[in-house]
Amino acid sequence: LLELSGRYDGSSKFPSHTQWAFFPSGSVGYRISEEAYFQEAKEYVSNLKLRASYGVIGNQEIGANMFLETMTKYTGDKGVSWLGSGDVRYDYFGQPKMVDPSLTWESIATTNVGIDLGFLNNDLNVNFDWYQRTTNGMLAPGKELPSVLGASAAYENAGQLRTRGWELNIDWRHVFHDAG
């Protein structure tokens, strides 16, 4: 068993030169229990299948306009009062935020390896899966900048996160017939 697929996604949340990305995936399976050499063992093991898969997806959920140099408007209590008299506060705009012009998709790669076993004519089934998920290019603050600059570091695709785990399922599916 073999399956391959791919996605070509675009998002307006990124600069035009990084808007589009390709995300491939595939899986392979081998049902050993259907092979001729395994037939003698089917008395003990009704089903034996090995599985593996790998896939990459993209994450565009980074916030709006993260790649544009925008200025923040301060109003109300955050306005300045030293320009006028009394309790009057005036709106003002802050310094443009720093941006990374190469901001792009976070990519999430998942690897999965598994085995399916069936016993007692598939009344008892055991499934085991091991997986690893790695997120590359996570949005994170960039290198620290001198405080005299007056702006915080631009966010960039600098982070990585890896999770690993396993899953074991055991189930019994016997059908009892009415004795009447």
Predicted regions and their residues:
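Extracellular/periplasmic, surface-exposed regions of secreted and cell-surface proteins
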Residues: 1-180
